A protein has these predicted regions:
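Cytosolic signal-transmission helices at domain junctions
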Residues: 204-222
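Juxtamembrane segments at transmembrane-helix boundaries
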Residues: 12-28, 41-174, 181, 188-192, ...
Length: 227
């Protein structure tokens, strides 16, 4: 399952990189690729059958990092200023707290809560950016709905997140919990859906920009003739 998820994430990251290379000055796609990169590395780390402190520390940084990059991608897509410094400080402090708890030998759930909350805060920033947009089109609304679903998944999976380091224990939870099976399936749908919607918005924005530029050039060229 982890390998399937990694393959999907890698393909989406490559797609984002291709979009960035093809459509210049579209920083939203490169931030999106960075978010997927964090998610891909996290998936690789979780495929390890042995739970090591290094693996836990890596995931503790990658989870909030992925959501921060996603938030920055949304901000770039909506042409908003970069992520607020206070949010970055809060996310960094929570992530550091998880690392300190790991070094202190805290329980798995207690250790994972700060960095999971950090990721939730970063995701909430992207959700608020979309919610506050006055003129939302159908893609904005769809993306907002997907991000809200992702937020629900993040909160619902907080208690069982440490079990991701133990595939056997996680399989037992999935067999016993219909909710967790639904959440896993939803997570595999929301990520590619959000990426494809954002790429569609980037492409449509570039097309609209080219049309406006062409219309402006046409009006400029016709101006002297009409006068």
């Amino acid at each position: 399952m982890h390998l399937v998820v990694f393959g999907l994430i890698a393909a989406l990251a490559i797609l984002c990189a291709v979009v960035y290379a093809t459509l210049r000055n579209q920083s939203a796609s490169i931030w999106l690729a960075a978010a997927l990169g964090c998610g891909g590395i996290e998936t690789v780390v979780l495929t390890s059958t042995v739970r090591t402190d290094l693996a836990v520390a890596a995931v503790s940084c990658l989870v909030p990092g992925a959501y921060l990059c996603l938030s920055q991608s949304i901000r770039a897509l909506l042409r908003l200023p970069g992520t607020d410094r206070r949010l970055i400080i809060a996310v960094s402090a929570l992530t550091l707290s998880s690392l300190v708890l790991l070094a202190a030998g805290a329980g798995a759930l207690l250790q994972s809560l700060p960095f999971q909350i950090a990721g939730a805060l970063a995701l909430a920033d992207g959700i608020l950016c979309l919610y506050r947009k006055r003129a939302r089109d159908i893609l904005d609304t769809a993306l907002l709905g997907i991000l809200l679903t992702m937020a629900f998944i993040v909160f619902a999976r907080m208690p069982v997140f440490p079990l991701l380091f133990d595939p056997q224990a996680m399989d037992e939870v999935l067999q016993q919990s219909t909710l967790q099976r639904w959440l896993l399936g939803a997570a595999m749908i929301t990520t590619p859906a959000s990426v494809l919607i954002m790429i569609a918005k980037i492409v449509l924005e570039v097309i609209a920009s080219h049309r406006e530029r062409s219309a402006s050039l046409d009006s400029t060229e016709r101006g002297p003739v009409d006068s």
